[in-house]
From Swiss-Prot:
GO terms for biological process: cell differentiation; flower development; positive regulation of transcription by RNA polymerase II; regulation of flower development. The gene is AGL72. It is found in: Nucleus. Pfam families: K-box, SRF-TF. Its main location: nucleus. GO terms for cellular component: nucleus. Disruption phenotype: No visible phenotype under normal growth conditions. Residues 1-61 form the MADS-box domain. Residues 88-187 form the K-box domain. This is MADS-box protein AGL72. InterPro entries: MADS-box/MEF2_TF, MEF2-like_N, TF_Kbox, TF_MADSbox, TF_MADSbox_sf.
Length: 211
């Protein structure tokens, strides 16, 4: 007879749960004993019941097995964390270096702004003056470039206005000339009205050729 597959989930019935716990615990310890004998392995197993009772099995002294396990885990943990510690130490050194660079830049910036100059030597003051002159030169170049760009824009606008003035002047000249010679400029209404003869005689009778 084929045994049905048991669904793995919590057994709700307390009595059935205790019976199953006892059977499975005995089976587990039996398998652990067989593994230690057949493979000459150091095996230990500990189980706490739902009520907190301890059940244990060990192929040798369980304390020695636990001690061996603790030493292994400590060595494993150290081996695993060593690269991490090195990485963290590297980050700390990098952070210290960056902080020092920031401090140097802040001091330099204050000196460039004319602050904290009392502690500067003649050489440092000369270097600061040279850097200020370079900065002023760059500012002047940038200012001149902006002025030149603005001047070019104004000149371009001036050319556009001149062209527009010439175009309007030419248009006005042509219009004046056409008015002087008596021609109607394009788009202007005519000053004379054409006469049209319309025949409006009343005729009664058959249609004939009219004279």
């Amino acid at each position: 007879m084929v045994r049905g597959k048991i669904e793995i989930k919590k057994i709700e019935n307390v009595t059935s749960r205790q019976v199953t716990f006892s059977k499975r615990r005995s089976g587990l310890f039996k398998k652990a004993h067989e593994l230690s004998v057949l493979c000459d392995a150091q095996v230990a197993a500990m189980i706490f019941s739902q009520k907190g009772r301890l059940y244990e099995f060990a192929s040798s002294d369980i304390r020695n097995t636990i001690k061996r396990y603790a030493e292994y885990k400590r060595e494993y943990f150290v081996a695993e964390t060593h690269p991490i510690e090195q990485y963290v130490q590297g980050l700390k050194k990098e952070m210290v270096t960056m902080v020092k660079k920031i401090e140097v830049l802040e001091v330099h910036n204050r000196k460039m702004m004319g602050q904290s100059l009392d502690s500067c030597s003649v050489k440092e003051l000369s270097e600061i003056a040279t850097q200020i002159e370079k900065s002023l030169h760059m500012v002047r170049l940038r200012k001149a470039k902006l002025y030149e760009d603005e001047l070019q824009k104004l000149k371009a606008k001036e050319r556009e206005l001149k062209d527009e003035r010439v175009r309007l002047s030419l248009k006005k000249t042509i219009y004046t000339h056409l008015c002087q010679v008596g021609e109607r400029p394009m788009g202007m209404p005519s000053g004379s009205k054409e006469k049209e003869d319309v025949e409006t005689d009343l005729f009664i009778g058959f249609l004939k050729n009219r004279p």
